[in-house]
């Protein structure tokens, strides 16, 4: 994939969408094959509350690109890219270790509906609760899988995480 993290990263980022809002299928981008594959159907009767993907040309310590949940009122097709603004982080661990995710909203030019949201603290409590509930429960029926949420991070923490993930990828 030739797409980078975004010309204005970490303030605005490219997010490659793997999983559309409302899907109960976990898709994953296979970098080697350059295709999106079905990883699995969620075992729980849940759907992704928002569009989910990653920032291209980033690398987390677990060897994967930095994950992003993009808030919105519409479902995006897998394989599309949306320019988004990070507004914070959700810190979590799963059976494989730390698995934090950036929380983002579409950039104002793409969708001005979120122009007043600059930090996860600005989100209605109901939306924060929906995100936590999804990630706490979406793996519950899968053998030997679990998730533990440890809290929220600010927009500054998200931008720092993005910078580090970009640098880690550049260093190889």
Swiss-Prot record:
Mg(2+) 2 binds at residue 67. Its EC number is 3.6.1.1. Substrate binds at residues 26, 40, 52, 138. Signal peptide: none annotated. Belongs to the PPase family. Keywords: Cytoplasm, Hydrolase, Magnesium, Metal-binding. The keyword Cytoplasm applies. Its cofactor is Mg(2+). One of its GO terms (cellular component) is cytosol. GO terms for biological process: phosphate-containing compound metabolic process. It is found in: Cytoplasm. InterPro entries: Pyrophosphatase, Pyrophosphatase_sf. Homohexamer. Mg(2+) 1 binds at residues 62, 67, 99. It holds the Pfam family Pyrophosphatase. It catalyses: diphosphate + H2O = 2 phosphate + H(+). NCBIfam families: PRK01250.1 (NF002317). PROSITE patterns: PPASE. This is Inorganic pyrophosphatase. The lineage of its organism: Archaea, Thermoproteota, Thermoprotei, Sulfolobales, Sulfolobaceae. Catalyzes the hydrolysis of inorganic pyrophosphate (PPi) forming two phosphate ions.
